[in-house]
């Protein structure tokens, strides 16, 4: 009797797995077709290649994407601004066609961004960062204030209010989970764990082409503001900052952001009761606030 029960369970599991493999393979194929539409370019920098999207005209917004991102996520974050500004949306280290410089630290990512801007003939830019991209954005503004017009942060990683006594050695998904099928099967758990719709998976595929970046974020980027706390003296920022955060964000603690913004000079903080980590439902409000921020900054020459 038990043999039949166990056999039936194994048969059902095998059928489920086969269905998920077929669905995942289809989704990965469609994701690669989707990426081709972005018209990404690749540039040779001193250390290797960087892929990016460059579109629009006007003041430049350099988009710094989060974990499981790439030039697609970087561009999608800013696509509502495409008619008013020039959007430069590169893949960070290890994501979608971008090589890694040195250890892949935020400081090295900043150096790579400077090279990219030089190649594209851009003197100054606004940095718009989401989630894990916050560390590189802060590093850029601190290291290169002369190249920075302003910081715009969406549910971004934020500096600590005091030096942490300890921090994890790894802050992100384990490397063995970073493959297309595993993440695809786990996607129904996105909502209860991260507050993200399961459909978010379709913007993360192909995971196989983002894995190096994900592991780098978890082992280096996400730890940098804790590990090198003294190097993130954000009180010295020379440009204005605009921060957006939803109170129900499950990935970036709202209370931590509330405390962090008090360290930042000339910082405007806009919070939402809901919207989660992706600030869903607030597109028009955000677009209006960002446009006002840039317009005001241009009138004052972007000085704190």
Regions found by a protein language model. Give the residues of each.
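Conserved alpha/beta-hydrolase "acid-adjacent" motif
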Residues: 250-256
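Conserved HGGG/HGGXW glycine-rich cap/lid loop of the alpha/beta-hydrolase fold
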Residues: 51-97
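Conserved hydrolase catalytic core segment
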Residues: 124-162
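Alpha/beta-hydrolase
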Residues: 171, 177-232
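Flexible "cap/lid" loop of the alpha/beta hydrolase fold
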Residues: 151-180
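Catalytic active-site module of serine/aspartate enzymes centered on a nucleophile-bearing elbow/loop
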Residues: 267-304
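Conserved acidic catalytic loop of the alpha/beta-hydrolase fold
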Residues: 108-125
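Short beta-strand/loop motif that positions the catalytic acidic residue
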Residues: 237, 243-245, 249
């Amino acid at each position: 009797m038990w043999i039949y029960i166990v056999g039936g369970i194994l048969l059902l599991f095998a059928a489920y797995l086969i269905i998920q493999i077929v669905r995942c393979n289809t989704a990965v194929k469609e994701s690669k077709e989707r990426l081709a539409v972005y018209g990404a370019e690749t540039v040779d920098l001193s250390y290797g290649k960087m892929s990016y999207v460059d579109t629009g005209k006007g003041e430049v917004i350099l988009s710094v994407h989060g974990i499981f991102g790439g030039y697609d996520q970087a561009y999608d974050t800013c696509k509502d601004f495409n008619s008013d500004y020039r959007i430069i949306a590169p893949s960070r280290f290890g994501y979608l066609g971008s090589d890694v410089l040195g250890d892949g630290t935020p400081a090295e990512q900043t150096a790579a961004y400077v090279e990219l801007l030089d190649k594209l003939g851009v003197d100054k830019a606004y940095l718009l960062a989401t989630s894990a991209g916050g560390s590189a954005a802060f590093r850029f503004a601190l290291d290169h204030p002369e190249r920075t017009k302003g910081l715009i942060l969406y549910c971004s990683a934020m500096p600590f209010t005091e030096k942490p006594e300890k921090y994890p050695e790894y802050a992100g998904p384990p490397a063995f989970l970073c493959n297309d099928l595993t993440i695809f099967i786990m996607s129904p758990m996105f909502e209860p764990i991260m507050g993200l719709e399961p459909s978010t998976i379709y913007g993360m595929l192909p995971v196989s082409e983002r894995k190096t970046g994900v592991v780098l974020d978890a082992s280096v980027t996400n730890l940098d503001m804790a590990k090198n706390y003294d190097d993130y003296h954000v009180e010295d920022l020379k440009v204005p900052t605009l921060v957006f955060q939803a109170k129900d964000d499950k990935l970036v603690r709202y209370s931590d952001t509330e405390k962090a913004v008090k360290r930042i000079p000339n910082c405007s903080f806009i919070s939402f009761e809901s919207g989660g980590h992706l600030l869903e439902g607030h597109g028009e409000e955000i677009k209006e606030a960002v446009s006002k921020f840039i317009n005001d900054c241009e009138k004052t020459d972007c000085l704190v």
